[in-house]
Regions:
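Histidine-rich, glycine-flanked metal-binding segment
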Residues: 71-85, 94, 99-142
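Histidine/acidic-residue-rich, glycine-tolerant segments that coordinate divalent metal ions
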Residues: 195, 204-327
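His/Asp/Glu-enriched, well-ordered alpha-helical/loop segment
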Residues: 310, 385-476
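Bacterial N-terminal signal peptides
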Residues: 50-62
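Active-site core of metal-dependent hydrolases
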Residues: 216, 223, 279-389, 396, ...
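C-terminal cap of metal-dependent C-N hydrolases
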Residues: 92, 451-452, 457-505
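Metal-associated gating/positioning segment near the N- to mid-region
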Residues: 139-205, 223-232, 299, 323, ...
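Bacterial N-terminal signal peptides that target proteins for export
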Residues: 23-53
């Protein structure tokens, strides 16, 4: 009998148990008359005896735990790699994410994944540290950008492709979009709908390149709601029946009672959601619900809020109209997505209650408009017409406002991601825009509490904060249009202390 090199970790035992449970399920299914293998065999050639099943399971357990093979069982599963290097930025002016003015020429020392020191005086680094020194030559060092409403799974993928393709293919497209997002200067995104848990893990473990991800998982929607992406031939829904394609992919989760909403919310939390996303009103891209519709009941919304709060986090809700927004606030929702058709009393209510407003600069886009169905075109025109009023109300009542792009199904728009930031100069100064997309968005992300996947300071250049940084050729606090061309103007992109781009070598 061979001995193990190490005791199996709890995570590995759990994975083994899950694997065995899956095999038991598969074994029983293989012997059901309705399953394909039995139909092909035409006879039940494999006896359904408990002794054979037990022998199979014991064998699987032995293989899985390495008891019959010279397999070393590692002590821990792959962890998140923490950079151990040292980087020194010299002679940079700092936009710290909060102050509207740049600092005097300064030096910034990064050790591992953290900003260790900021000083106007020279910083001396131990010669043995093998530090990488980057001469800023007066350029601007600023926090990495944060998009508070992004969809890595859906931003650049056309909707028909999303709804009809294999999950493996869609994951590859999402991984490509993740790298493009980081190379655009976005070191963190709050992903508000889509199966990105595996992608997040791969990025965190250094397998793939991309931003930090605050995942919501599946968008929770009522039947006929904005997140009901089912084809008509998938209706009527049969209780206990198979899930729809969009649910199987993890894009959406349909729920039609407080108990079902609670279950769907808990499922996302089980996957590791940092916040829960509910569809509580009509949307533009969904053809079967009016933009004016109010979705879910207050008890249904409250069920999600309770599930999230029990996990130390919060619910954010998609809504455009005052009635839907008010119902969500009454049920305990902490953040409203969109809200472009809000009225003034509801805006004041948001300010009074301290509700976050995740608002996007949605505006007329000829290319996007022509690709829409007539139903969506009509709704888009309504929303676009409300954008200016929404931002003016947000400023008037000093509502806590987050910035995000919410680009969907449009590869061209995804490539122009940064223009959704520069266009904000219609309502805010460049420094205010940058603060919104860095420190303010970082404050919103912190609402995820104990479900925060990256507990630490984000969106600021301050001692002790995560080293998520951009070195910009020019002053974006004076000229916000610099962000429109990250390939040209972002000389260095650093995330978690690791340099992903450096054109100053």
């Amino acid at each position: 009998m061979k001995t193990l090199a190490a005791e199996p970790a709890a995570e590995e035992l759990y994975e083994t148990a899950s694997f065995v449970y899956f095999i038991r399920w598969l074994w029983s299914r293989c012997l059901e008359p309705s399953f394909g293998l039995t139909t092909i065999w035409k006879f039940k050639l494999v006896p359904r005896s408990s002794s054979l099943l037990a022998a199979l399971l014991v064998g699987l357990c032995q293989v899985s735990l390495g008891q019959d093979y010279d397999i070393e069982v590692p002590g821990q599963p792959p962890g998140v790699p923490v950079p151990k290097g040292v980087t020194l930025f010299q002679n940079v002016r700092i936009f710290d994410g909060t102050s509207p003015t740049l600092t005097a020429p300064s030096n910034v020392l990064i050790r591992g994944n953290t900003i260790e020191q900021i000083s106007a005086s020279p910083i001396t680094v131990d010669a043995n540290a093998n530090a990488q020194v980057i001469a800023g030559n007066g350029r601007v060092l600023m926090p990495g950008l944060i998009d508070a409403h992004w969809h890595l799974f859906m931003a650049a993928t056309p909707q028909p492709v999303l709804m009809t393709s294999e999950a493996s293919y869609l994951n590859l497209l999402a991984a490509r979009q993740a790298e493009a997002t980081l190379m655009g200067g976005f070191t963190t995104v709050r992903d508000l709908g889509g199966p990105v848990f595996g992608l997040k893990r791969a990025i965190d473990e250094g397998v793939m390149v991309g931003p930090r991800i605050y995942p919501s998982g599946a968008m929770i929607s009522q039947t006929s709601g904005h997140g009901d992406l089912r084809f008509l031939f998938e209706l009527p829904r049969k209780l206990g029946g198979p899930l729809s394609n969009s649910e199987l992919e993890g894009i959406a989760a349909i729920a039609d009672s407080p108990d079902e909403v609670r279950l769907r919310a808990r499922e996302q939390l089980r996957h590791g959601a940092s916040q829960i996303k509910l569809m509580v009103g009509g949307g533009v891209s969904s053809p079967f619900n009016p933009i004016e519709s109010t979705q879910f009941t207050e008890p249904e919304i409250r069920a999600a809020v309770e599930a999230a709060e029990n996990w130390g986090t919060y619910v954010t809700a998609h809504a455009y109209m005052p009635r839907a927004i008010r119902q969500a606030i009454a049920a305990g929702v902490k953040c409203i997505e969109h809200g472009h058709l809000i009225d003034e009393p509801t805006a004041k209510l948001m300010a009074d209650k301290g509700i976050w407003w995740s608002l996007q600069p949605l505006r007329y886009d000829e290319g996007a408009f022509q690709r829409m169905s007539p139903v969506s075109q009509k709704k888009a025109l309504q929303v676009w017409a409300g954008t200016d009023k929404a931002y003016k109300l947000a400023k008037k009542y000093k509502i806590k406002t987050a910035w995000g792009a919410d680009i969907l199904f449009d590869a061209g728009a995804a490539r122009r991601h940064m223009t959704d930031l520069s266009v904000m100069a219609q309502w805010y100064t460049p420094a205010e825009v940058l603060k919104m997309a860095t420190a303010d968005n970082g404050e919103l992300l912190a609402l995820s509490g104990i479900m925060n996947p990256y507990p630490g300071k984000l969106g600021v250049v301050k001692q002790g904060a995560f080293a998520d940084l951009l070195l910009v050729d020019g002053d974006p606090t004076a000229n916000i249009k610099l962000v429109e061309d990250p390939e040209k103007n972002f000389m260095v992109i650093m995330k978690d202390g690791k340099i992903y781009k450096n054109t100053l070598k």
